[in-house]
Amino acid sequence: MFRVSLQATRRVAFRSARQIRFYSAHPPSGGVSHMNKPALLLAGFSTLGAIYVADGCPTLIERKPAPAEKPAEETPAAGQSQSISEPTKDADESPVSAQEEGAEPVTTPENEITYSEETHQALAATLSGDEPAAIEPVAESVNEQATEPAASGEATNEPVTGISEDTKAPSLSFDDSKTAKGVVLEDEADKKEIQQTSPDAVKTASKDGSEGESDVVLHEKSPAEAETITEAEEQAEIRSISGGTAEQSATAAAAAAGVQGEKKNEQQTAYNPETGEINWDCPCLGGMAYGPCGEEFKSAFSCFVYSEADPKGINCVEKFSTMQNCFRKYPDYYAEQIKDEEEASAEASKIEDKSTTPVSTATSTVEVQTENAVFEPVLEKYVEENPQLKDTPEAAAVTNTDDEKK
């Protein structure tokens, strides 16, 4: 700064000297004295001003003072709230804290409640359940000396925070909680466990633990006596019954009725001879009672079941033919039944060509052969599983046929 001022002073002095010399050598048209006075005054003031600045004197234009550094904020001691003046609080845009509104100070590492060894031992004894003891916390701060617990019963003015005197030990220990959880798990396992009942009825346990009779009664047949009928065999049996005529259907039903007489060999059927009712929801029917031809199927099946004619079901031929005609109207739905009927008819036709019966009885022969081809597997199954039926007239035909084949 001093060097710049010195250079400016020299320039002004040289310029003033030039002007004085110029005006002295070339005076204007007026008087010389009149023109030299302003030049001399200008040169003189310029020189004085340069010298004034060069000497480090204060300038006429004052500079703005540099901003002073803010003093570091003092952190209040533990247990003391920071006092904020009203102007500073108004100027501060930050929200007012809860402590400024009068709330109790939050426990921090600097302002936390500590306990003496005696108090700690009393607390441990209380939690273990040996003896109840009142806990008197002692607050220790930076600026205040630690006070001893009032053993003599003296009251203190400072508010006591932390654990109250009503603190109690937990009701269950770690081992007790494990035991309680084990009891709950065992109870749930007992509820979900499937209970076994007598062979008269099969009962299952629901998720709620309540027992109820199942809709479908399971087979109660021991594996040593006979094999259980699978669902596929039952479906094939019903399709065979629906595709055949009344005579062989009566034979199959009679064999089934004989099997039902034995409790140990009891099979799953839609008809219950004890109650005389037909369970149309039985899985053995394959849902045919609710198809497009459900009414025709119910009519033919119930007629066969309740038939008292000899042979059984001979009076239901028309209803079975009506059911078969209905099947042909819905080939997509009853494709398997129609296929079984056609195969049975084809086999019966081959047998008829080889036979020597008169032409007058050809029609009846074809019907009988068709029925035999459809219901023969069903009757064989019942006869094999129930040897006591071999002496019945309905099963005699099947036995003779097997002997002839052998």
Swiss-Prot record:
Cu(2+) or Zn(2+). Residues 24-37 are mitochondrial matrix. It is a single-pass type II membrane protein. Residues 55-406 are mitochondrial intermembrane. It is found in: Mitochondrion inner membrane. GO terms for cellular component: mitochondrial inner membrane; mitochondrial intermembrane space. Residues 242-260, 356-365 have a biased composition (Low complexity). A motif (Cx9C motif 2) lies at residues 316-326. Residues 1-23 form a transit peptide. Residues 67-110, 142-276, 341-365, 384-406 are annotated as: Disordered. Disulfide bonds join C282-C284, C293-C326, C303-C316. The CHCH domain contains a conserved twin Cys-X(9)-Cys motif which is required for import and stability of MIA40 in mitochondria. This is Mitochondrial intermembrane space import and assembly protein 40. The lineage of its organism: Eukaryota, Fungi, Dikarya, Ascomycota, Saccharomycotina.
